[in-house]
Regions:
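N-terminal secretory signal peptides
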Residues: 1-13, 23-33
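Hydrophobic alpha-helical segments within soluble ligand-binding/sensing domains
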Residues: 101, 154-180, 195-196, 226-227, ...
Length: 345
């Protein structure tokens, strides 16, 4: 039913990243999560038949970060998407624990769940499980990255996401600051999604705003770390103008740090931007604060991919993998923000 694919780049190591990658939307966060990585979409080949697709009645969604709001949203929307095709959706309860995730996946293999969509917490450790799934004739779809052993994958335009935010911030810097000022980046270098987003964000900004001084690049993917790292940056650079995050969660922590340091919420000389389309960030953008941009993923698009990619593998489609679209939202995009908020409700 499936074929193995050779990954074009080594996969990432331990990953908490998309726990905060909202949109995944993450959502996100989330999505949130989400990044050695290909700059462009990768597709896994698969073999099979249309009749195999008709027999696909169950899909297992293994999303380990069950404690975040995105999990509930993703399960709800994926269940509805599956139901349209007469498919029941199974879920794990990993509790953000890699050992629990491994145990739950082993159970699914023993039960021969016909299609598994898994967001590995530890990509290297998932290789053996994915290989065992393929050997058992099951479909394995990797969520948020790529494995050597897989039927297909679901990715989120990683590089483009960072590029959109970097470009938006650079344009704002030119318009509001005359191309001068100080910028700090909250980054991730632990997984494919994070590395690609980080590279897109930094490359786009520094290329388009060479007159803005880069004063810090700090690892942060969650609100608490973003808050702490931003406070440390502000202690050295209280006149920081721009803070860009690899996730909305980290950027939102920086947003709060700036306010705690005395920055007014609508300060005309401050720009915060993030990635995922996380609800707090979307609300801050809509309210006209200095949180001015998010590269947002639509939860409906992710949920549809969770169902459509395994179905495409089962049907024998040559390129079953999905690249979930991403779009930039800012203060003028009220309708788009409202639509994203509605999907997360």
């Amino acid at each position: 039913m499936t074929t193995r694919r050779s990954a074009t780049n080594p996969t990432a190591s331990r990953r908490q990243f998309l726990a905060y990658s909202g949109a995944a939307a993450a959502v996100t966060a989330l999505t949130a999560a989400g990044c050695s990585a290909p700059a462009a979409s990768t597709s896994a080949g698969a073999s099979g038949s249309a009749s195999a697709g008709a027999r696909l009645t169950k899909i297992g969604l293994d999303y380990p970060f069950t404690q975040i709001p995105l999990y509930t949203t993703l399960v709800k929307l994926s269940t509805a998407a599956a139901k349209k095709h007469g498919i029941s959706l199974l879920t794990t309860n990993d509790g953000a624990n890699a050992d629990t995730q491994a145990t739950n996946l082993t159970t699914w293999l023993a039960r021969k769940v016909p299609a598994i969509v898994s967001f590995p917490m530890v990509f290297e450790a998932a290789e053996a499980t994915a290989e065992a799934a393929l050997d058992a004739g099951l479909i394995w779809v990797t969520y948020g990255g790529t494995l050597e052993h897989q039927s297909a994958d679901i990715q989120f335009s990683f590089r483009k996401s960072g590029t959109l935010v970097g470009e938006a911030a650079a344009k704002w810097a030119e318009d509001a600051l005359g191309g001068k000022g100080k910028v700090a980046f909250l980054t991730d270098n632990t997984i494919e999604l994070g590395r690609e987003r980080t590279k897109g964000m930094i490359d786009a900004f520094t290329r388009l705003a060479p007159g803005v001084d880069v004063v810090a690049q700090e690892q942060a993917i969650d609100p608490d770390t973003g808050l702490a790292k931003a406070h440390a940056i502000l202690a050295k650079h209280p006149d920081l103008n721009i803070l860009l995050g690899v996730t909305d969660s980290a950027a939102y922590g920086g947003f709060k740090a700036l306010q705690q340091a005395g920055r007014k919420k609508d300060d005309a000389k401050t720009f915060v931007g993030g990635q995922d389309g996380a609800v707090p960030s979307l609300l801050a953008i809509k309210q006209g604060t200095f949180y001015r941009a998010s590269a947002a993923l639509a939860p409906h698009d992710i949920a549809n991919a969770v169902v459509d990619v395994p179905r495409a593998v089962a049907a024998g489609k040559a390129t079953p993998s999905a690249q979930v679209p991403i779009s930039l939202v800012g203060p003028d995009d009220t309708a788009a923000i409202d639509a994203l908020l509605a999907q997360n409700s």
